[in-house]
């Protein structure tokens, strides 16, 4: 019997593997500038693919018009608001820095503290004592750091050229994926089937459902909370409400919620004696926070029938591990792992559940 290893040329195998490895690394290195844009485009296209198909039907089956409309919609949703936000931040930075560094920056009197029952007068006297004894020194120490901190954030916001470039790549790749969506899906599913047979195909379909669930449950909820919070801030008279609204949306995406922005805004209103508007914003903030616990689980269930805790854990962990793109990568990885483990366990039937009486009988027999 002939040994199959006799015809194996070991140096040829080694050089072939080294060559394949070098080609893969070189290809990845060449495509490295496009990874982030392509990843975002993939997530956006998968999340909005049902909308794209419905739009194509409304346009009498014209794929080109549907691609143009969806790309233009993405342009309106992503590029224009971000450019306007950064320009507004840069334009208003000079006045903010000068105000923080000037002598006009003073702590308010907080006379409304006296109206608080029982402890109001004591709080007001303690606050006035703090201002009289150490307020000036505190302001002197805080002012340089506040100005420098604001300047740092403004400088970082000014370097948004690379970010805009990634967004442009995202738009280009999104248009290409919309145009060839079925072909790309077929190639990915074929590759998955080659790796894992039928389970590989189900993993690809599950990944698409997970991305849509995150887009519906997390992104849509963050947008709704941000818009409602921005309306409340604007009505209450909070300055720079549009900038704060964008900040709230970011906080909601990273699962911190709107309270890190709304609570300081409420304190600022009470601080400046606007108790009525402070109370209004407080009630509105409670409504916005309650909406998060109602809307998000419903939207996630629409996208995929999986545990909400699993998706939210993936969102938070993915953000910490991969940044903003981890918002989608984290849930996809956890959900795929969850389904693979579940399907592997389901290959063997689960043990029969025993009643309390049966368990006691078994324990009694063992003792005897």
From Swiss-Prot:
Q: What is its main location?
A: membrane
Topological type in the membrane: Multi-pass membrane protein
Q: Where in the cell is it found?
A: Cell membrane
The answer to keyword Transmembrane helix applying to this record is yes
Q: Which Pfam families match?
A: AI-2E_transport (PF01594)
Is Membrane included in the keywords of this UniProt record?
yes
- Which keywords has UniProt assigned to this entry? Cell membrane, Membrane, Transmembrane, Transmembrane helix, Transport
InterPro entries cross-referenced by the UniProt entry: AI-2E-like (IPR002549)
Transmembrane ranges, per UniProt, are 13-35, 39-61, 68-90, 159-181, 216-238, 248-270, 277-299, 314-336
The record's Gene Ontology cellular component field reads: plasma membrane
Q: Which family does it belong to?
A: Belongs to the autoinducer-2 exporter (AI-2E) (TC 2.A.86) family.
The protein's name: Putative transport protein bbp_117
Organism encoding this protein: Buchnera aphidicola subsp. Baizongia pistaciae (strain Bp)
